[in-house]
Amino acid sequence: MLKQVIKTVSSSQAPKKYFFKQFCTSTTEKKGRVGLVTLNRPKSLNALSDGLISEINSAVKLFQEDKDVGSIIITGSEKAFAAGADIKEMEKVTLPDAYNNDLLAQWHDLTKIRKPIIAAVNGYALGGGCELAMMCDIIIAGEKAVFGQPEIKLGTIPGCGGTQRLIRAIGKSKAMELVLTGNNLTAVEAEKAGLVSKVVPVEELLTEATKMAEKIASYSQLTVAMAKEAVNASYELTLQEGIRFERRMFHSTFGTHDQKEGMNAFVEKRTPTWHNK
C-alpha cells in the first residue's frame, strides 16, 4: 500500500521529494535520503490509536527496506507530537483482554528498526507520546514542547517503556517524580535533564531535524547501524560487557568496504564514497 508513489517533486536546488499514499491517520514523505512520518489525528491531538501505531510501524519498515533512505524522522503537529494513547480505545479493556492480547506490544516494533530515528517534537508529548519519543534514537524539541507521563492521573501507570526508559534518560529521582506526580517537563527542562538533545524555535524544528537526519544519512548506513547497536547495547550490558561488545563491533568495521573507503579518503584528502557494505 505504501509503496505506491503518487507525486514526485524535484528541483536543481532541492533533493527529490516523494509523497507516498496517505494513510488514515498519518502521512509519509521521502525527502532526499530522509524518510518523514507525520502523525495526523489533529482532532485528538495525535492520540496513539492502534491504527496510528500500525501505520507508523508500516512506514518505518518501508523506510528500513529503502536503500536510499539513511535516517527517519517522526513528527506531529505544532500543537501536539502525540498527547498520549487513545483512552477511548482503552477505557473498557479488561485484565484478560490486556493480558491475552498483550496490549501495546506492537508499539515496540519501532525499536527493532536499524536505521536511526529522530523524534521532532512540538507541543504535547505526554504518556504514550513521551514513550514514543523515547523509543526514537534522538529527540529534538520545539521550544513549546511539553513532556510527561501523566498516567497516574488515570489510575494506571506507563505501559510502553515509560518507567524504564525515563529513568535511563533522566535518572531515578526525576523519573520517579514525573511518574508519581504526573508533572510535566518543558522543553528547556527536558533538555537540561538529558531527555532532549536540543531545543529549537518552533518554526525551525523540522528544518533542524532534517539537517541532522541528512548529516547522519550522509555516512555509511552499515557503520551508522553498527554505531546505533553499540550505543543501545549499553541499556542491557554492564560497563565491562559493553566495552567488550563495543570493541568487537569496532573490530568488525575493519571487515567492511566502507571502513577502507573512509580511511583511504581521509589519507587522500577527499570525500568518501560509501557503498553501505
UniProtKB/Swiss-Prot annotation:
Enzyme Commission number(s) from the entry: 4.2.1.17
Cellular-component GO terms for this entry: mitochondrial matrix; mitochondrion
UniProt-listed InterPro entries: ClpP/crotonase-like_dom_sf, Enoyl-CoA_hyd/isom_CS, Enoyl-CoA_hydra/iso, Enoyl-CoA_hydra_C
Residue(s) at site: Important for catalytic activity: 151
Subcellular location: Mitochondrion matrix
Binding site for substrate: 85-88, 128
Keyword Mitochondrion found: yes
Keyword Transcription regulation applies: no
Pathway this chain belongs to: Lipid metabolism; fatty acid beta-oxidation
Catalyzed reactions: a (3S)-3-hydroxyacyl-CoA = a (2E)-enoyl-CoA + H2O; a 4-saturated-(3S)-3-hydroxyacyl-CoA = a (3E)-enoyl-CoA + H2O; (3S)-3-hydroxybutanoyl-CoA = (2E)-butenoyl-CoA + H2O; 3-hydroxyisovaleryl-CoA = 3-methylbut-2-enoyl-CoA + H2O
GO-annotated molecular function: 3-hydroxypropionyl-CoA dehydratase activity; crotonyl-CoA hydratase activity
PROSITE patterns documented for this protein: ENOYL_COA_HYDRATASE (PS00166)
Organelle targeting peptide span: 1-42
Pfam family name, one: ECH_1
Free-text function comment from the UniProt entry: Straight-chain enoyl-CoA thioesters from C4 up to at least C16 are processed, although with decreasing catalytic rate.
Subunit structure: Homohexamer; dimer of trimers.
Domain notes: The monomer is folded into a right-handed spiral of four turns, followed by two small domains which are involved in trimerization.
Record-given protein name: Probable enoyl-CoA hydratase, mitochondrial
Organism classification: Eukaryota, Amoebozoa, Evosea, Eumycetozoa, Dictyostelia
Gene name, Swiss-Prot/TrEMBL: echs1
